[in-house]
């Protein structure tokens, strides 16, 4: 489907291609030659004729003014020619607006061609690879630096030998070797010219001069002068020796690309044939060089461009307003650096012309050629220029054209991908506990400024006596009290977007309904802070106003905070109560035995509340109420008993929940488990569950005649609800009340309503279907909810518009379109925000009771354990004993250090366990309440308060060498801090702990920056991955099982978690052959539990890794969208979400920390952020010693210690693996492993290809050589999951799969066959498959290639889109490659479209489904047949013609600056729409709340 809001018949750019500019191109762009280095006249400030700012070339400085006779024309005269004076007739200046100075170009006619700097400097010199010069007769290549010497006129090159044996073609003649080469050449020429008397003498004289000069001191010190000898050689023979750009031009014009291409391909084939099985590094290097040459030659052949276009004959001059000259106060001027660089070129070019005219010596001209070449180089790319960039007087390097493109501040990232936004403000945030979840408090003055145009519109419509924009604006600017009612009206149904930097994931920008508040700070709902990662210690947030209708609808439907309950990374609610709210709810649900008036009966809820308010009972008292008094459907459905008991607090909590939500009875201990640990101590662990009316009602109800008090005394005391339980309840609320009926269906019910129809509303609603196609009559909760909402809103509208008084002017006889629209709008808003309404009630309860509880903490609340001091004393004795052992030589120092650290870690652990018991036995203690409720603090914090602080970090730098050589790195101080904060630290202990504290802060800061960069790289990798179709039809699944840590044999991620929310690839049967789930079915949580319960350990699912959709994914391979808990919609930008989900928690991954200070090596090193980068960037040398992997399927024959030649042990193991080769013969492969590495195999073990033989990280490229891509994908997936899960961060597999799919999406061509590919090229897997499919169908030979793994750093650079690649990194290199290949960008990804200012091809601008979440229509469009008494211009009727007419009218009624100066105030308001009148006060810099 296409979007209702999209503009029709707008001319769209379909693709953008980049090629080399030919000489003709430059002349066709140009409007004249810039021949003078002047800019503007220092007296008149007018641009100089033929200078860099000439008005005739670049356009007028004033709108529609002739640059010669200064006549002012009207807009209607645009593009005509002025003929007022004779000069005008001669020059024929065009009448143009001043904006043309941003687009009109000029050129400088260079007096000598110049080689384009990028093409011999970037990417190891395109020109060098293209020419691939070799010295004739020998195999010596001409290097890149040799070529540069020619370009800068330092050396000469033999272009033609003319039959002279002493000259070899393509030989570079260096100034030091010139004497011998020229002497040989002259002697040969002398032989040929024996008969030519005059010539013979001239040549002989020259030869003698040369020998004499070469032998002299000057000749030996400075080398000889080439030029006169060149002239003689060229005069008397066919030889040709050249230098500089002319020599390069000659070479480029005479290269035969077809012939070169064929020769290179033959050479590559020869290398491949000779090295079928293994290739030496020198041969591989040679082949690589040939691949690169072939790529460039093929680029020129395919694009049909001429190699000589790499030279510049006419240098384009960019438009004048893009390199402005700005007047500063005090008559000074500031100019763009580019003007200075152009001036140097013009000055040198003009001087060269003078040398030509005065017939100067060659040497002088040659020097000028070189200076001209260097000047053009500086203009193109000053920062890369060697020996150093051109600098200004104060020594700063000039910014050249390239510098304006690259980097964060370059054109791409600063102006094209990120722009400053008008209608925005920012301020500090404070908490707004009274707000609804979809509301935000906006300061009044900020709102007045943000919504100024709308407010002015309202005031002019409705306020008497104000009929000019100027007057209305004055009211708004002065914040006149008259405006506030209008501000309120404007804010209705106009959401604003809130953003908190850093924007790590999509929930960092959400929409809210603004509410006006006094003060200067923005008020934020407390529950959305988690999503923004905000707190109220001075954070700031930015506000943006969506302007168009489409933007407003998107904000309301897709971005409203109350609809973004689930976090996209794991599908768990991100709107979880915390801190105060948790403490309040914990306090509210405390249950105690033997309270005053326990077991008392109250006939109603209100009576119970009265007793509570009069302090007869407290919140923890267990009391009895009649079941009927609770009006809870969820209880009435489950029991016939008349009475129910719970605590007062829980009755209050459940009363706040909806009537059909389960009654929550609290947390019950189901069993106590006791076990003994390794120290022989008894450990008690509790198993608990939340009791609800769904399953456990029988425990909590009484029958007639029961003794309430006695029965309650016997009952167990339930535990209060902590953070985890409340999170479960929130999840439950979400699942129960999230909308399941779409707006289209609700509108059909409303369509049938009129005054009489309300009676059968129940029947109409029960016919509705949910998203699974089931009728609503099966889902009572939603049926009742919809009926209630429609009824309530219907009656409100009746009361508002249909007055009881028949004569009333407000009395509408019939329902019209606006009434239906309003009803749908209100019902849909309440229905889709119902979850947030319930959560708001929970929030209010939490705050209320945390206030009422009056919980405070003091020093006396810190309870200590009596055994702490004894444990520390015992540990001190044991560490002393270790020192003794070391002195006696039983231990090495490293072993002693490691054991000491282990001892202190154990002591701290035992103290923590002891204190945990203390906490569990004192649950009334306010400090422990905070701890056990999960409101704040952890057991480890409390251990530091009451037990001991423990071991501290040291400032040892951990080096890669330590990891590789398995040194014990002493990154922990071995003397711990033995005091707790309660005791107070000694001076030494305080000093010792400062380092660790600072390290923590610096690590976090560094980590945040690295994590941000990682997210950026991942987004670049996956930005184009969007859900494009329903089903790609892939029959190739992905087999998943539990992800286990093979070392500890613990499950990292269970099968159930991995398959839930995915589609099956094949039918799944249990052991008895009974079908559990069909093929291509969604695995729901229930099905997933059933599969695991039936003992199935492997499941084949549809996966991102085997999806056949090009440039995206299909719904079946992706599965469930975690943020909505539904099957994903077409148009969802899953690539970006995947990147955000992996990058956002990146900050929480620890840096490389050594946990127990244990032995460096093994698992310690491979944790954390560094390892994640290693995997995602596919490092060839990971940290530590890489694992040795088996290359074959075979058996470990023997493992022995390797000995050197002298028979001594060399410190390595030799593992012999026996396997069968392709011909079935037995072979043995030897693997060498360091003896310090732990082995993972033993003698006699069967091994498979890719299996680890020793501990350590696997090098991905090595793994890919020995196994298929599936195994590599599995390995990366497992490793990344391991990193996150060990830190307690859950991320869905599918996100990591998307990144892996992109990393393995390129194929390196080895044999091109009959395809259009060439050897060594990297092509996209989809392109490769398509091309091969076509070749096979035509009976031709297909191409053969191998999959290559590319890290996240390189993947974006290999993108099909050159715009996306150039805006990422290495801009110049990408543009060079794209231009020689004449690459075309089809604008398929998100980034390319942002760059050229189009909507991204995702979301509401994609090909979405009819009833998908992106099909956003105006509410009124759901009622096409309803009567509308207010005819307006409908959206479809606003065509481009209408808009054009409007603009033409505005432009014609525009006046000149001079007339403008003489206007009086009364005339001013007519100008408000004119494009000449630029209202300064709304400019970006003056905007009071503008971004940054």
Curated annotation (Swiss-Prot):
KW 4Fe-4S (keyword) present: no
InterPro entries: DNA-dir_RpoC_beta_prime, DNA-dir_RpoC_beta_prime_bact, RNA_pol_asu, RNA_pol_N, RNA_pol_Rpb1_1, RNA_pol_Rpb1_3, RNA_pol_Rpb1_3_sf, RNA_pol_Rpb1_4
Name of the protein described by the UniProt record: DNA-directed RNA polymerase subunit beta'
Pfam families registered for this protein in UniProt: RNA_pol_Rpb1_1, RNA_pol_Rpb1_2, RNA_pol_Rpb1_3, RNA_pol_Rpb1_4, RNA_pol_Rpb1_5
Any one cellular-component term (Gene Ontology): DNA-directed RNA polymerase complex
Highest taxon listed in the record's lineage: Bacteria
UniProt region (Disordered), positions on chain: 1473-1492
Cofactors: Mg(2+); Zn(2+)
Binding site for Mg(2+): 535, 537, 539
Protein function: DNA-dependent RNA polymerase catalyzes the transcription of DNA into RNA using the four ribonucleoside triphosphates as substrates.
Record keyword Zinc present: yes
Xref: PANTHER family: DNA-DIRECTED RNA POLYMERASE, DNA-DIRECTED RNA POLYMERASE SUBUNIT BETA
Cofactor note: Binds 1 Mg(2+) ion per subunit. Binds 1 Zn(2+) ion per subunit; 2 are expected compared to other organisms.
Organism field: Mycoplasmopsis synoviae (strain 53) (Mycoplasma synoviae)
HAMAP family tied to this protein: RNApol_bact_RpoC (MF_01322)
